[in-house]
A protein has these predicted regions:
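Transmembrane alpha-helical segments of polytopic membrane transport and secretion proteins
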Residues: 1-15, 259-267
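Transmembrane alpha-helices
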Residues: 68, 146, 169-205
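Glycine/proline-centered hinge or cleavage motifs at structural transition points of membrane proteins
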Residues: 106, 165-166, 179
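Generic hydrophobic transmembrane alpha-helix motif, especially the helices
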Residues: 100-138
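Interhelical loop and adjacent transmembrane-helix boundary motif
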Residues: 47, 51, 203-249
Length: 267
């Protein structure tokens, strides 16, 4: 029976790996022939979106960086409070439950919520800042929970040694705990960025579809995911769709590999 179960587990692992390899191979085979410098740094032209995707790359980087700047301070401060200052009880458990529930909200729901709140109610319009605020809500629970776990993983004896030398609570947190947990915190941030880059529904409802180079946070734009969705959905230029998919996949895989590198480096 042990050999049978071992075979079942091994088959499940192989199937998972083969599915991933098949997806990557399919995208690479169809997308690689269309990748060039003109495609990466050019502008879409005409109704068939011929040319390149440079404005969509800029929009993706812009909105993701803005979302990270909004999310990270809030998530880290909340995690520090939960791990170091808050008394464990029902309130803290409620906050953790709310964070976990927020992480499970479908992106389409978050997109509609972002449109209703940021675009309409707050009057920010279809813009980078509207999309960044909505993406920050998706990133927040990932960074917060990862940071809290990273802080709790710092050995207690390090804190006790600092207290024994006369350090204050804030000095221990800022000078010892957070630097010790930095690797895992950075891993959580990188994973959250990877998820934000791959989101479509949220940015579709909050940023719009305009093909331009955004300068102000109030400018609209078209990220790579929305560009890919429009190309594939309308079937107007599947070559550009496969090329965009390949670049997007490479970016997300690079962030995931970087997160694994940070995690292993700090062990």
């Amino acid at each position: 029976s042990n050999k049978i179960m071992l075979g079942v587990f091994r088959a499940a692992a192989y199937i998972t790996t083969l599915v991933l390899v098949a997806i990557i191979a399919y995208v690479v085979i169809n997308g690689l022939p269309h990748i060039s410098l003109d495609f990466i740094f050019g502008w879409p032209q005409g109704v068939n979106a011929e040319g390149g995707i440079w404005p969509t790359i800029v929009s993706t980087v812009y909105v993701t960086a803005l979302a990270m700047l909004i999310c990270t301070p809030i998530a880290v401060l909340a995690a520090v409070y939960l791990a170091e200052y808050a008394k464990q009880g029902k309130v803290v458990e409620l906050i953790r439950y709310a964070a976990d529930a927020l992480a499970s909200v479908p992106s389409i729901v978050m997109g509609l919520f972002g449109y209703a709140l940021f675009v309409e109610a707050m009057g920010l319009g279809l813009s980078m800042v509207s999309a960044a605020l909505a993406l920050a809500l998706l990133m927040l629970p990932i960074v917060m929970r990862t940071t809290e776990e990273a802080i709790r993983a710092v050995p207690r004896y390090i804190r006790w040694g600092a207290y024994g030398l006369g350090a204050t609570k804030w000095q221990v947190v800022s000078k010892i705990v957070l630097p010790s947990a930095f690797g895992r915190i950075a891993t959580g941030i990188v994973l959250a960025i990877g998820r934000a880059i791959g989101e479509t529904a949220v940015v579709l409802y909050t940023m719009g579809q305009a093909i331009n180079l955004p300068i102000s946070p109030l400018d609209s734009g078209r990220p790579m995911t929305v560009h890919l969705y429009l190309l594939a959905n309308d079937g107007i230029n599947m070559n550009a769709a496969y090329g965009t998919a390949l670049l997007l996949m490479v970016i997300i895989l690079a962030f995931n590999l970087f997160a694994r590198f940070l995690s292993r480096k700090r062990r």
